Amino acid sequence: MTMHRRNFLKHAGAGGLLGGLAGMAPIEALKPLTTPAAGNRIGVSTYSFWRFDGPKENYPIEQCIEQAADMGFDGVEILLIQMGSEENAHLQMLKRRAIELGMDLMGFSTHQGFVDPDPAERMENVELTKHQIDLASAMGIPTMRINTGRWGTSGSFNELMENRGIEPPLEGYTDDEGFEWVIEAIGSCVDHAAEKGVVLGLENHWGLGRTAEGVLRIIEAIDSPWLQVTLDTGNFLEDPYDQLEMLAPYTVLMQAKTYYGGGTWYTLDLDYPRIADIMRDAGFRGYVSLEFEGKESPDTAVPKSLAVLRDAFSA
């Protein structure tokens, strides 16, 4: 297995490392990996074609794959809650259709929640996550987005967004306890992920993962090559570039938000050339997955978004 760039110095033996670098300038030896000559591959999440409040059948996954291929994307990230079926025949049909169109199924976006004082609820979400890993493996998808979950004290998601993603813990509990639950729960999933060959990507997605510091607290506590970061450019509402830079070395998949027509909850003016420079400096070579979250029709907004990302992430 190729060692992750952030773990090289940590796991290399001191003698072997010093011997291997003898006669080499340290600044050259410790350079991050560079991106491929053609730049990062650009994919699209099926979320980009799916309306928030519409029925799943509005955009079946196979139609998203076909439309993504027609638009010129390299791959597709599948949103689980958009799938019409979890039957194996359906999974293999999606895999076959992607192969026919020359498309990678490169990401699987799932939901779970571990911020719950009830151990039985947390275990139920652990088993759910393991099941989702099995689905990703069956489709040959190499990485899966996971969440910490949240306290739920904000009520609806709209209320959470009005509070800029910030919510207090349940009465009688603390965020520190919540982190302990999340670390224990996700930590119990990584061996299954390793067995199935699916790298988990913890997203900066509200809850205890709202900040880069929160995500890093979990990643570093578990310390597994099978738990990395799914980095969402649109989920840092304060100091976005500083926080993106903190998580860039851990990133296995980047989700890139665009907001043509205005966002549903907010609109961010993201500087993608700057973001691409941050990711290049960290040695990120993985997929950039478009998540279009605006009110404009995907038929026009998604191709425009692809052009922006191609331009920014080309070598």
Question: Which stretches of residues belong to each language-model region?
Answer:
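Histidine-acidic metal/acid-base catalytic patches
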Residues: 2-43, 48-71, 187, 195, ...
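Active-site acidic/histidine proton-transfer and metal-coordination neighborhood
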Residues: 13, 20-23, 97-107, 115-228
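Charged helix-capping and loop-helix junction motifs
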Residues: 58-61, 90-93, 122, 126-129, ...
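Residue-level detector of anion-binding/catalytic polar loops
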Residues: 74-75, 104, 142, 199, ...
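Conserved beta-strand positions in the central sheet of alpha/beta enzyme cores
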Residues: 77, 107-109, 145, 201, ...
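Short catalytic-loop micro-motif centered on adjacent basic/acidic residues
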Residues: 77-81, 200-204, 230-232, 289-291
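Glycine-rich, proline-tolerant flexible connector loops at the mouths of alpha/beta enzymes
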Residues: 77-95, 151-155
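Metal-dependent catalytic neighborhoods of phosphoester/phosphodiester hydrolases
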Residues: 86-92, 119-122, 299-301
